[in-house]
């Protein structure tokens, strides 16, 4: 019997319509919502009106003057972009069986919002408005700098020029902006975030799926931060090619543990952070030399291999051949006898993800399957690909969430370690080919480099 999702059970279709001036974190929040829901197996997609605007505008300059509401020609182009986006959203629900769409734009006037609400309701889609309102000058400037360096509108501009132009764009929108109001908009379903979480206004949230979205956005913090991911150092079980267990580190694993602080400081300097580990010995030993506050999470323990715990893949293939084949055929859904599947791990990781979104700088030291699930969340990796990603030992992965994606930096410790990666169709471990997924390639490209 197959799994069902929240959206399958209730046939809910929700369109989250973003509201807010530029540089308030709307695109960041939009992308986070999509990644979160997709990670939970809910079919969701973001429709960024800026992309549609660039498509319909041709060679028209995207400077601040383009957003002058009194420029009728450019206003018509922006309206056309919005029309194309909402048309695609309707098709996403009616032809692709989507569950949640995010309409990512300023939607700064009540007239625009009513137009969107009417279209959604006409097509049996539940509109849910989400406003990010802020007068936090520091946050706005930081967001403007981030957008100036990452937005496609400014790909050929110097950072200081892009920032100045973007601030002028904000001023154009401020002239006509109408924020959501609990009285004037009392008949609408909406959530309003004031200065991120200083105040949260919730109005007419009716469904379970809407409440899940509300709970999630109340936990995210669109502020600059770093997240480091690392497997424990090489363990004795790794050397013996066994899975699971609670073995100690090998000699090389202890070498990695002693070098980990240096790797973190080289990537970010002197910085305050918290270290999260699982309850298993090998992660705690890896964190032992770090001078930071430490927190253990049972939810970060390795995927439970059930009856196969402590066995090699060769032994599993010999003793449980049908299970071995079934896991290769559907690694995300397959559950070890008496153990867990990758889907089970995702479910138990949800509280970890929520708390991770609330925190600032965190170093997570955990296990291969768990890191695959966490990395898949931040990088929006499809379910069928995530269990096949290679997360090598003795490698620190630095994630930097940004407005238009997550910046990834891979830092190798240059301390040898065995490979525990098993490709599909074999019981042997080790990097046998380059035929795996794009994320396999991403995490195995050599020299240190930054990627989006």
From Swiss-Prot:
Active-site residues (renumbered): 104, 232, 302
Site positions for Transition state stabilizer: 231, 238, 367
Residues binding beta-D-fructose 6-phosphate, per UniProt: 53, 78, 106, 112, 169, 173
Binding site for ATP: 20-28, 143-148, 324-327, 368-372, 404
Chain residue ranges for the region called 6-phosphofructo-2-kinase: 1-223
Stated regulation of activity: Inhibited by fructose 6-P, activated by glycerol 3-P.
Keyword match Nucleotide-binding: yes
Binding of beta-D-fructose 2,6-bisphosphate, residues: 231, 238, 244, 313, 327, 331, 342, 368, 372
This protein's GO CC annotations: cytoplasm; cytosol
Matches recorded under InterPro entries: 6Pfruct_kin, 6Phosfructo_kin, His_Pase_superF_clade-1, His_PPase_superfam, P-loop_NTPase, PG/BPGM_mutase_AS
A Pfam cross-reference name: His_Phos_1
Ranges where the record places region Fructose-2,6-bisphosphatase: 224-452
E.C. code: 3.1.3.46
Any one GO BP annotation for this protein: fructose 2,6-bisphosphate metabolic process
Keyword Phosphoprotein applies: yes
Other comments on record: Present with 1680 molecules/cell in log phase SD medium.
This protein's name: Fructose-2,6-bisphosphatase
Gene name of this polypeptide: FBP26
